Every structure is written in structure tokens, then in C-alpha cells.
Amino acid sequence: MAQQTFTGRKRVRKFFGHIKEVAEMPNLIEVQKASYDQFLMVDEPTGGRPDEGLQAVFRSVFPISDFSGTSMLEFVRYEFEPPKYDVDECRQRGMTFAAPLKVTLRLIVFDIDEETGAKSVKDIKEQDVYMGDIPLMTMNGTFIVNGTERVIVSQMHRSPGVFFDHDKGKTHSSGKLLFAARVIPYRGSWLDIEFDAKDIVFARIDRRRKIPVTSLMFALGLDGEQILSTFYKKLIYKRIKEGWRVPFDANRFRGYSTVNDLIDADTGKVVLEAGKKLTVRTARQLQEKGLKALRMSDEELLGNYIAEDLVNPKTGEIYAEAGEEITDKLFKVLNEQGYKDLPLLDIDHVNVGPYIRNTLSADKNMTREDALFDIYRVMRPGEPPTLDSAQAMFQSLFFDAERYDLSAVGRVKMNMRLELDAPDTQRTLRKEDILAVIKTLVDLRDGKGEIDDIDHLGNRRVRSVGELMENQYRIGLLRMERAIKERMSSVDIDTVMPQDLINAKPAAAAVREFFGSSQLSQFMDQTNPLSEITHKRRLSALGPGGLTRERAGFEVRDVHPTHYGRICPIETPEGPNIGLINSLATFARVNKYGFVETPYRKVRDGRVTDEVVYLSAMEEGRYRVAQANVPLDAKGRFTEDLVVCRHAGEVVPMTPDKVDYMDVSPKQLVSVAAALIPFLENDDANRALMGSNMQRQAVPLVRAEAPFVGTGMEGVVARDSGAAIAARRSGVVDQIDATRVVIRATEDLDPTKSGVDIYRLMKFQRSNQSTCINQRPLVKVGDIVKKGDIIADGPSTDLGELALGRNVLVAFMPWNGYNFEDSILLSERIVKEDVFTSIHIEEFEVMARDTKLGPEEITRDIPNVSEEALKNLDEAGIVYIGAEVRAGDILVGKITPKGESPMTPEEKLLRAIFGEKASDVRDTSLRVPPGVQGTIVEVRVFNRHGVDKDERALAIEREEIERLAKDRDDEQAILDRNVYSRLADMLDGRQGISGPKGFKKDTKITRAVLDEYPKSQWWLFASANDKLMAEIEAMRKQYDESKKGLEQRFLDKVEKLQRGDELPPGVMKMVKVFVAVKRKIQPGDKMAGRHGNKGVVSKIVPIEDMPFLEDGTHADIVLNPLGVPSRMNVGQILETHLGWACAGLGKRIAQTVDAYLSKQDVKPLKETLKRIYGEDETIKSLNDNELLELGHNLSRGVPIATPVFDGAKEADIEEMLKLAGMDASGQSTVYDGRTGDPFDRKVTVGYIYMLKLHHLVDDKIHARSIGPYSLVTQQPLGGKAQFGGQRFGEMEVWALEAYGAAYTLQEMLTVKSDDVAGRTKVYEAIVRGDDTFEAGIPESFNVLVKEMRSLGLNVDLHNSKLGPAPTSEAAE
């Protein structure tokens, strides 16, 4: 699996996977990008946009007509204007990265003929209207909102459609199953149809009061007889001599208990004696023998139901209504009237129950009007119904496209479930749909069919960014529609333009609200590249229209068989959100209906092909799917007789010819984070969950190092997350420095585009989590790169591979109790060599506002501050870049005017003599908060429009303009070089018919001739070849345009820089200061491996005290072996052994590299590499210099890839250990660093990839001397953010009581907490140097007294000796 890429040649991973991967892994952030592109459709031509996304929203809301119908506002098209600021400018200025939306609307005014009412068009006006800004997505699938990066998480919700379910016997004490159906639209009213305990069928609309389902059918326009004929077959019983001739049907009579003998109506023979039960088998035998009909007596027909009204044709008298039960009385009438045929309903109480018939007879409503009134009263209680209003309301509930939308998904699901064939453009319900739902529900009650599993992924779908945004924008437009309608009626429609009717605020507000405060719009987790990718691939069941934590039961959270290959069964948070927030599996994608699909290889006649098909959960249920690790022969046929397959949620062995599909890869069932854990298959699931979650918390280290033991996914993550920069086009590196890479393109040379790609690198930027984003180039000038090659590493990436931690030498052994309970013992080398050192960038900002008493000022001139404290500030009062600051230092000097206090005459005199002194301002400077110390890396100054810039702001601006000018000049130089070299190639060797001054006509143009003239004059040369001249002319035109474009872009950017900034109201100036903090690892920091093996650093030990190996190498980390057996994450042990082998092989390679350097012989290096890698294509293609560089890169350790579920086996690890010349047990003799004696037993030693997590002790440790108090109780606040105190709770009080420490206890509950007067006295006593104090009444006691008084209980305090004690009021 060698990648022939620029970085792939510098470090080759040995690949242990056996299964070839056929499917390309989709781009990992495609979910976000594709969805939003489909919503905006920026690149689609404005005329031919399909009806989806934003286009669909406008189409659904427009046209808008006024109330009288005299005018109409139509939507024509929309387009986006270019965004005002680019991504980086938005980040810096705290703006939203958005593009203005311009919509073309057409206002049509009609003339209405008063007599005929005919409409004719009187006037048409078209105009472009601004409809607010729509946020744009960045290249990496995020949004910049108010300067911060946010991610819109996709939401899992119940798919629209129809669902059948039962109450699992919980409602009724007998445990009887009550079935229910629910029709869920995308938007609109829900319709529930349910059975009650008496088997009557009811309907509910929007969870309101229930009504009999027959009332709903009446409202749909059916009458009683039609209802019965819809749900029941009609049987005609004929009158014969001894009774009735009844048609015989085996299915209908199975399970029939006979009262009298069963007699064949045609022959008169007895076919079954009385008192016996007709079994299914007997019934079938009778039918096969030719039994056509049975003879039954009158009494055997009692209890059946009439199928249609029995009416006397002459008089019109009704003897019996449809659905009436047959009684003796009715028989008398029938016999009197001489009925020969009797139509009965086919209800046998076994296969067909009388539920609808019973509901009909229980229903009080008899007509459509009654039913409509009843529904109206349920929906709008308290309003008197009229027939029109009731009809209109019922119509609008389910049949009006404006209010009810099943969506294409809902329609498709409904068609599948009910076996209908309505087109997916039919978005409202139809009469047939409702009847089909009731029919299916009744069938379920009769024991036919299955209920739905609502946790099946075929019944849950994903709403991605585009769709969430679409719904939000629709809400905004609907709010706008009301306002437009009212305005159309109130203005003179003939004189207005569309612009005057529209106020875009509601639409813009809906968008802003969604991005700013929706539960699904989240602050991006930017700790490292993996956490970014995982955040974008997250699926949440929470959010508006989703579940809530409290209500979600166990079933929703559980892993479902349909999750296979779609949703990761491992990666989900621990705690209350477990199972509600999931991650998309590696190969999964979301289809156009919002269902998650996973790829499979097609199997034809027992042979696996390379054709890849994506299937959703519903489709997959129909097929048999084999695992990816089933053994195949060279032709792709199954080698085993039985293949284990998944089919309809079960695992069954099948013969190869029955298999339909096969998995594409073993890692398709896990998410990206879980696929990064080597030997995942050897870890317990709970620990794998912790492992995949903790990788997302790994802090980017100062020196990233890719893992020795990887899984082959590292490169994919680094590339797709956008942390590492990939080349957009193939080309040659032209220029390079720390902040940018300039590549001259050699492919995709479009004459309309620049031939130069400039890649700007991010240097020491702050991420959302305050970690450091820093990119560094990997290429040198003159390197040839292909499209897609990695040219720069980002945070946590190393040679284009994800590198979250470091490879460290670990020994598994106890060490003086310092690794008790998962603690971690570290060597001092780790601190000294900055192995786990990370840089964190803190941002501090200060604003100078305009206050009532005058403007605040940012200045160096601060009252009562020593010159020493100002040493880091420049003349503008802002700290220098590069200054070292610590807690309490001033970053930005600021003074605020304070209110005039009355002055004494002496003060007035002094004031008059010495002029205005600083007594009327107070110091409100920005200082470094406690616990922070570091170096200033960046300062940004923002000024309001029209406010004069200070010296510092001007200096920053000058620097920025210089940078822009350099970019422009470089691009210009490369452009010139490119164009003039192409021009010289074109002219070289041609016959010149004219040229610049001094050129002789008809002379041959050569390079030498060209060099005599300045390049700008080369355009004057002309040749007789017209085609050539046309090409040159086109090139010149393109060149001039490019030049102009470059200059224009430069001027635009400079203009933006010099223009003032948009600051919040009342703010005159804002300064942001960025402090870089270097955090070395220290006791209290949390570390973890990739297998959920986490712990806290307990002690850092001098190198010489650490256990060491026979060759004198000291261990870097000592872990407790007891952390492995009970946790069952054996993967870490296998990783240790394999890492040990990698390091050993690295040493071997280092020796051969040294041999090459001393003897110039490359053979030993080639042979060693061949022994390790076998026949590797990449290594074969390298020249000697490249081999040497590869050797250098491999000398610390040979990186290997062991993919999940398809990785190295035990035998492979032993073989690697042998190859490295190590003991195959993976254990070594270890010596005690303090005594030098060997330990009794051999110890497992090897390399593990350890991460430093974001839970750093520096961020958590905190101490308070004095600080803020809570307003009511006057107790200190809590928490580091509030600079709070430590809570002395109930149990701590018990502890002091138990020890009888009365005075300590009193002090804790009074002066150290909320005895206001006592606190002040203690302070005064300390100032005097006195150490006595007296405790008073705690403020919380006064609060209690007040509460009791509010309940009407007066409380007075009395001191037993001195009478009433003063309470707080008395004191006041």
C-alpha cells in the first residue's frame, strides 16, 4: 500500500493489511460541504436551478398576492454577490463570513373588470432586492460567525412517513397489545390512529382528544356502507330447503368449532361431526376433495353482520342497516318477506375481527357534517363551527400543500410501507393514504404483518446543514410574507417598486438566530485536526425537533444492527448523552433522501466483483451481505462452502451462490477516530470508546511525531481536515519562506487563470481551544510536486500524517507506589527534551468606550503606577511583541474618567497651581490574569471609523501593506517570467516582418535578438504567421488583465486596511493581545494512550533513577501492569511489542545509513529495507539520495500500519521482533536505576504512542485570597472563572464537628464565609498585627430570617444576658 506521493517517498509505512480495498474512502467532510453546496447552488446557472435548497424555499413562499387579488409579487431568480471580507479578515475583525443575497422580484398589478371579474395585467415591474447576508462555508466545512469558527452538526430525526407500533402491553392490565399507527409529515399535523382496550379504533389529530376513526372517514366523504365495503368482503348466503347455502373457503373456516354437524350443501353428507374443531389441515383436505359449500341452519347464522341496507323496494322501509347484527327478530322479518339472498360481512372473529364495524356502531356521528363539526370542535375548542369553516379547516389539515408537507422522503417511505404508487411529488395526504393506513393497522390487529422498529436506520434520517438552514430560512420568509401582504394592501400599488414592499429583517434575523444560538450550531472543537473532523461528522439526536436527554430511553441509545457501516458503534460520549450523539462511520455517506448509506462490493454468481454499490439500511435488509474478511481465491471466489452473512438483522451461514454483496473494508463499521486505534479488535468496547474520545483531546505538541504503530488512516485525516496543506495543482516550488509557499503551476494551465499558486501558512494562530495552529513547509525550492501532495505540515501532523502524541519507551512494572491507580511515572528526559511540551495561545482584549463622563483612553500615562510596571509598553500604551509577561503585568494601559467628587479648598488651590492632575481618572488597564505567563506573539488594534489611529496601529498597518505588496510583486514577477518565457518560445526562430525601433525587417528572431531589447518591447515583434500573432495577442490581453487584476486586488485590500473597523456601538477602540504560553508536562497533567489507558502524571523522576535496559537505555514512562487485565484493553500490549520491534528495526537502518556515510555503499541499506518491507514499489523507485533521506527518517523507528480488524497477528509481531534481533517474548531484563540491581522478573518494555490531553493542571489549579462575593448570601463565589473560593460543605462541617474543632468551625462558617462585619474586622486586625477577632452573625442567617418573615413567621433574636440582639436592620 505504498503511496507514491511527495511525503510518501520520505517515510514509507510497512502495511500489515491483507484485504485489498476497492472503494476509495470519501472525503471525510463531504457531509458538510455537499449539503451546503446543494442548498446555496452558487455555481448553478441562475436560470436552470433545480427545485431544491434555497430555490425551493423561494418557490414555496412566492408568489405572494394581496388580500384582494389585485397585485402579485413573483420570484424570478437569486444570486450572491462576492463577500465583503475574506475568511481571515472575518476571523480577525470578529465578523461573519457571508455573502449578500440579491433576489430579483417581479411585481404584477392587475386590472379587474368590475362586471365580469376578469383579470388583465396592468403593469409589471422587476427589481433586484437585497435579502440579507447568507453565511458561506469555508473550505474546511465550517462557518465563521462573529469571528469564531462554528460547525453545524447534522441531526438524526424520525423520518417522515407512517409508523405502526404497539404499546408492548403496558397500557392495559391484561397485557393486551394495543396497536397504533402514526403518520408523521415533514411539517404539518400529525395523524394518530389507535385501538383502545375494547378494540374500538380511534383517530387523533396533533395529539388532541380522540375521535372514532369512522368520523374521520365520514369527513373524507364515505358513508357507512362504503366504509364497511372498504374493510370487509361481502358473502352472499343463498336460501335452500333446510337452511342456508354457505360458500366454503379453507382459510376462512380454519379453527372453526362446530356446534352441529357440518353438512355438504350439495351432497347432504356429514363432513365433520359436531363438537370438533376444524383444523387447518382438515380444512385444506376438505377443499382439495372438492367441498364447495356447507349447509347451515338459521341459528348458526346468528351473530353475523348484514353487509348492506335491507330495504323494501316498494315502500322504502329499511328492515336492517348495513353492519347490523342478525337476531331472531330479524330472521322473522326476513322469512316473512321471503329473502332468497342474504349479503353478510366476511367477519369470522378469528382471521377478520369486527373492529371497524363495532367502531361504526359506537360512533355518534352519522353524517359528514356531524363528523366535520366534531373534528372542528376538537381542533378549535370554544369556537362555534359553520359548515364552511369546518370544511376549510379539515381541508387545510392534511390536503393543503402550504400547511402540510410529507416531503419526498415521507412519500417514498409511505409508498413502500403501504404498497402504494403515488409519485414523490404528491406531498400531501390523499383519501387512499388514510384508508390504507387504517387497513394496515386493522390487519396488524388481525395478526397479519409486523410492526415497525423505530430505531431502524431506515426509519431515521439525517438533516444536514443545508436542510437545517433551508427550514430556518423558510421560517424567516414566512414571517416576511405576512408583512408583505399587509403592506401590499396599505400602499398605492401602482406607484411602488418591489423594494418598497420588502423588509428583509425577519429573514436575516432567522439566519442569524440559527447560526448564533441554535443547539446544533456549535463552537468548533479545534483541539487538534482529528477533533475538527469528528465534530463535522457528528450526528446528534438532540436539538429542535429531536429528542431530549431526559426523555430518550435505552432503545434509542442502543447500537442497532442497521448501524453496521453507517454509524460507529464505538464512538459516542460517556455520560447523559451516550448513544444520542454518534459519529458517521468511515465510508458512510448521506443520500439525497437523508438516509445513511454504506458501500458494498457486488457479488455475481459467487464471485466478488470490484463494482461498488452504496446501500441504505432499507435496501440492505433485502440482501445477504458477507463480511470483508471472508477468504477469497485469486479470481475473487469464496473458498469456503458456507459464508457467514448478514440478512434482515440476523447473522446466517449461506452457500456462496446466495450471497449478494460483500463489505468493502473491515474498517467500514467504525468511525474515523476509532479507525485510528491499532489493534482495536483486541480492546474491550468500553475502553475503545474512551480511546477514540481521548484522541480528540490530545494537545498538539511542539514537535509532532507520527506513531510507529499506525493504522494507515493517519494521512487521510491530516489531508481532509485541512491541517496539512495539499497542492491544488502540479508544479515546481518557486519560492518559500516560513509564511508562504509559491508554486509555479505546470498543469491545468488555463490562460484565464494565474499560473502561480500562493499558499499562505498559518503561523502561531490561536484555535478555539487556545491550542496553537502553526504550519511549516515541507518542500524546498525546485521540488516538483503533484496535485494532492502535502506541501506543508500543520498542528499535530508530521510529514502529512496525523501525529497527536509521541512514541515513548514504556516499562510495565510497579515503581514505589507512584503508579498506583493508573498514575503515570515520567522520566525527567521527557521534560528536559520538551517531548510533551505544547504551546497555548491565550487571547485578551480591552475596549475603550465612550462613557457618560467622557471617553476612556488607551495610554501609557496611568495614575499611581511605577515606571517598572510600564516597562513593556510602547508610547501608545500597548505591550511590545516579544515581551515576557507574568500574572499581574499590564498588557494595555487604559484610564476611565470617574465622577467628580467634591473638592476641598486646598485641593482646588493645588489644582489651580499644577493644572489637571490624574485624580479624575482611574486605572482600568488590561492585566495578565493569575496563572498565566508567557510571551506576547501578536497585537491587533481596531479603530472606529473616523477615530485617529495611534502610532502602534499605523505601524501594524504599514507592516501589513508591505506584506501585501510583497505578495503582489512576487506574483507579478512569476507572471512576467512565465509569460515572457512563453513569448520567447513562440517568437524564437520565426521570420520577423516588423519589430521595435532598430529591428531590421525580415530578419530571423532569435533569443540573442530578443535579449537586445527590454522585455516590454517584445510585444512589438510581428511574424507573417497570422495564427501565431492571434495567439500572442490573446496572451498579451490575458497578461494585461492579470496585471490589472493583481493591482486591483492589492488596492482593495489596502483600502480595507485603511478604512476603520466596524466595532460594537459605543466602542472607540479595541486592542487584542495574544500571549503564547509554553506548557511543559508536570505532575497533575492527564496523559493517555490510544486504548483508553488514561492516567495522571504522579511524579517526574531524574533519568538516573528510572529503570534501564541492558544497553543502558532508560525507560521514559513506567505504567502499572494492573491497569491492563481488568480493563481488557490488550491492544496496548500488542502495540508495545510491535513498537519495540519498530524501534529495533530503526536502529538496524541507522547502522546501515552510517555505513553508507563512511563507505559510500548503499547496498546494505537497500538489503535491510528489502528484508523489512519486502518488494515495495516506492522503495524500488528511489534514487540514492532519496534512499538516504528515507533511511534518516526511519532511523528512530520503522513506521507500520496495522488496519483495524485486518492488522498484524501475533505471528507477525513475533516475526518483526526476530527481524529486529529481539526476544520474541517482547520482555527484557530491566535494572533498577537507583541500585543498579536487575529486577527479579523480566519486564514488558516497548514503545507506546502516548498523548498529552487537554486537561492540564495549570488550567485547573487555582487559589483565592480575596475576591467577589455573591450578592444575596454574601458568600464567596465558586469556580476558577469567577475567582471563587473552596466550598466548605455539609460533610466537611460534620468532619469538624466530629473532631470537636469548635473554633475552627465557627471561623469557617462566619468570618471566612459570610459574616460581613466580621470579615472587615479581621482585615483591620491583621493590618494592626493583632491576631484576635470575634465572629458575628452570618449573612445567610439574616437571609433565612427574611425568608421566614415572608412566610409570616416573625423571628426576634435575644441575647440571654443582654436582651434583644441587634439584627442586620437594627445595625443599619
From Swiss-Prot:
<dbReference type="InterPro" id="IPR042107">
    <property type="entry name" value="DNA-dir_RNA_pol_bsu_ext_1_sf"/>
</dbReference>
<dbReference type="InterPro" id="IPR007121">
    <property type="entry name" value="RNA_pol_bsu_CS"/>
</dbReference>
<dbReference type="Pfam" id="PF00562">
    <property type="entry name" value="RNA_pol_Rpb2_6"/>
</dbReference>
<dbReference type="InterPro" id="IPR014724">
    <property type="entry name" value="RNA_pol_RPB2_OB-fold"/>
</dbReference>
<dbReference type="InterPro" id="IPR007642">
    <property type="entry name" value="RNA_pol_Rpb2_2"/>
</dbReference>
<dbReference type="Pfam" id="PF04565">
    <property type="entry name" value="RNA_pol_Rpb2_3"/>
</dbReference>
<dbReference type="Pfam" id="PF04563">
    <property type="entry name" value="RNA_pol_Rpb2_1"/>
</dbReference>
<dbReference type="InterPro" id="IPR007645">
    <property type="entry name" value="RNA_pol_Rpb2_3"/>
</dbReference>
<keyword id="KW-0548">Nucleotidyltransferase</keyword>
<keyword id="KW-0804">Transcription</keyword>
<dbReference type="GO" id="GO:0032549">
    <property type="term" value="F:ribonucleoside binding"/>
</dbReference>
<dbReference type="InterPro" id="IPR007120">
    <property type="entry name" value="DNA-dir_RNAP_su2_dom"/>
</dbReference>
<protein>
    <recommendedName>
        <fullName>DNA-directed RNA polymerase subunit beta</fullName>
        <ecNumber>2.7.7.6</ecNumber>
    </recommendedName>
</protein>
<dbReference type="InterPro" id="IPR037033">
    <property type="entry name" value="DNA-dir_RNAP_su2_hyb_sf"/>
</dbReference>
<dbReference type="Pfam" id="PF04561">
    <property type="entry name" value="RNA_pol_Rpb2_2"/>
</dbReference>
<comment type="function">
    <text>DNA-dependent RNA polymerase catalyzes the transcription of DNA into RNA using the four ribonucleoside triphosphates as substrates.</text>
</comment>
<keyword id="KW-0808">Transferase</keyword>
<dbReference type="InterPro" id="IPR015712">
    <property type="entry name" value="DNA-dir_RNA_pol_su2"/>
</dbReference>
<dbReference type="GO" id="GO:0003677">
    <property type="term" value="F:DNA binding"/>
</dbReference>
<dbReference type="GO" id="GO:0000428">
    <property type="term" value="C:DNA-directed RNA polymerase complex"/>
</dbReference>
<dbReference type="InterPro" id="IPR037034">
    <property type="entry name" value="RNA_pol_Rpb2_2_sf"/>
</dbReference>
<keyword id="KW-0240">DNA-directed RNA polymerase</keyword>
<comment type="subunit">
    <text>The RNAP catalytic core consists of 2 alpha, 1 beta, 1 beta' and 1 omega subunit. When a sigma factor is associated with the core the holoenzyme is formed, which can initiate transcription.</text>
</comment>
<dbReference type="InterPro" id="IPR007644">
    <property type="entry name" value="RNA_pol_bsu_protrusion"/>
</dbReference>
<dbReference type="GO" id="GO:0006351">
    <property type="term" value="P:DNA-templated transcription"/>
</dbReference>
<dbReference type="InterPro" id="IPR007641">
    <property type="entry name" value="RNA_pol_Rpb2_7"/>
</dbReference>
<dbReference type="Pfam" id="PF10385">
    <property type="entry name" value="RNA_pol_Rpb2_45"/>
</dbReference>
<dbReference type="InterPro" id="IPR019462">
    <property type="entry name" value="DNA-dir_RNA_pol_bsu_external_1"/>
</dbReference>
<dbReference type="GO" id="GO:0003899">
    <property type="term" value="F:DNA-directed RNA polymerase activity"/>
</dbReference>
<dbReference type="Pfam" id="PF04560">
    <property type="entry name" value="RNA_pol_Rpb2_7"/>
</dbReference>
<dbReference type="InterPro" id="IPR010243">
    <property type="entry name" value="RNA_pol_bsu_bac"/>
</dbReference>
<comment type="similarity">
    <text>Belongs to the RNA polymerase beta chain family.</text>
</comment>
